[in-house]
Amino acid sequence: MAALRLLAWAFSRRVSAHRPQPTLPHHLIRHYPTTRCGKVKFYTDPVKAVEGIKDGASVMLGGFGLCGIPENLIGALKTKGVKDLKIISSNVGVDDFGLGILLASKQVRRVVCSYLGENKLCEQLYLAGKLELEMTPQGTLAERIRAGGTGVPAFYTPTGYGTQVQEGGVPIRYSPEGHLITLSQPREVREFEGQHHLLERAIRADFALIKGWKADRSGNVIFRGSARNFNVPMCKAADISVVEVEEIVDVGTFAPEDIHIPNIYVKRVIKGPRFEKRIERLTTRDSPPAPGSKDQDPKRTRIIKRAALEFKDGMYANLGIGIPVLASNYISPKMTVYLHSENGILGLGPFPLKKEVDPDIINAGKQTVTVIPGGCFFASDDSFAMIRGGHIQLTMLGAMQVSKYGDLANWMVPGKKVKGMGGAMDLVSSKKTKVVVTMEHCTKTKQPKILEKCTMPLTGKSCVDLIITEKAVFEVDRSKGLKLVELWEGSSLDEVKATTGCSFKVCPNLKPMQQIKSDA
């Protein structure tokens, strides 16, 4: 009974994770167990913390872009000099930071990721036949990792149906001469409740290198801001998870309900000796766009002001980078729209002031952001559960091409441009989500972007509901095709027909292209 009274007293004294003082004296803590069997080991040297990672090992790297990456442990891998690594990561960072460091030192044989972003080195190595690259939709990657950590060998998802992910044939490896050597394999397809799904297999790794905010001395871990991202599911899906943190605190500092990763998933912990916490895209609202920039282009502004009319009060929406994000600037202050970011935020606010910039709070475009009161953070697997589950009412994104029947292509130009699909395939996979495409009507070479059939690899099949360009607005019927419903006053019907690569119907009640009022 005395022991029970002691424990009850300890729990009554617990505090929030944001208050670092201990809640129980050390001489009392020693009288009951605070760690599991197979005690978590603590390190001071990052190189020793990655002991056991050998040539050819599979390694998960937590983070999203440069946010929440285990930068000290990545540096230790470079120092250690292990080669032929298979890296599983959401993104590949930039050329000279994060995963880019290991690519530059030629230590990586294969990368499994969803998005290359601005890492030109990774793209060059891939196209030159010096790197294997397995592109996976971001939500599918998160779920494959989550499944690996929970003992589920495989699962079905609607993401990627009708694309090369399903059909196979996505280049994984080129020869130095540019010939295809390895291609992705087709997926098994089954139909559930009238919708096609792909079979995806779970993924595990030998090691996971994780970045947390704080750990207690029994190995429990908490994260800060949007740095939770892929760190949480990855920590659970490896034989050995190594967590670097900014601070190690006493047992009892965290209230049990505040712990994000229980110590059962953690094998090693190290307090990082230094953190650069580099920001990939510093964006603030007190830095106006330069004269002549894309943000002041009248064509883009026209699309933005029309796109803003798609927001409804109380809506949950996900916005792609560029025009969709800029459309959120026109949301009326009388309206509440909950903006979702696939890296783990619900309730995005405006870009920060310079003094408010926080490297642990970024959006899916790697831009610094703020979060509105009532907003929240979560891990990437939870984020894509919201997306695939149809809890997001609107997704707005750009496109390279859209077909007459709503097929979307926006992630790859074979042999030339390789960015990756990111979360786009997941975002367009739910039948409950309205998909709006915002884009310029033609390419820079004046070629139509609205076509009878897409010629580039698809992001989604029959998934687009509305197309907004600087010339017109089209509704998409996925069996009957396009209907022109709005026309910009400076454009003519003949001009739109001449610059559109497919036939379309004209609404009998054709309207001038609508624009939100700036003071709405």
UniProtKB/Swiss-Prot annotation:
InterPro entries: 3-oxoacid_CoA-transf_A, 3-oxoacid_CoA-transf_B, 3-oxoacid_CoA-transferase, CoA_trans_fam_I, CoA_transf_AS, CoA_transf_BS, NagB/RpiA_transferase-like
This protein's record includes keyword Magnesium: no
Pfam families: CoA_trans (PF01144)
Enzyme class, spelled out: transferase
Active site (catalytic residues): 342
GO cellular component, one term: mitochondrion
Associated pathway: Ketone metabolism; succinyl-CoA degradation; acetoacetyl-CoA from succinyl-CoA: step 1/1
UniProt-annotated location(s): Mitochondrion
Stretch list, region Disordered: 280-299
Keywords per UniProt: Mitochondrion, Transferase, Transit peptide
Residue range covered by the transit peptide: 1-39
Example GO BP: ketone body catabolic process
Catalytic activity: a 3-oxo acid + succinyl-CoA = a 3-oxoacyl-CoA + succinate
Disulfide bonds: none
Keyword Mitochondrion found: yes
Superkingdom of this protein's organism: Eukaryota
E.C. code: 2.8.3.5
Tissue specificity statement from the Swiss-Prot or TrEMBL entry: Expressed in flagella of epididymal sperm.
Gene Ontology molecular function, alphabetical: succinyl-CoA:3-oxo-acid CoA-transferase activity
Protein family according to the UniProt entry: Belongs to the 3-oxoacid CoA-transferase family.
Subunit structure: Homodimer.
Record function comment: Key enzyme for ketone body catabolism. Transfers the CoA moiety from succinate to acetoacetate. Formation of the enzyme-CoA intermediate proceeds via an unstable anhydride species formed between the carboxylate groups of the enzyme and substrate. Probably play and important roles in the energy metabolism of spermatozoa.
Protein name as catalogued: Succinyl-CoA:3-ketoacid coenzyme A transferase 2A, mitochondrial
Gene name tied to this protein: Oxct2a
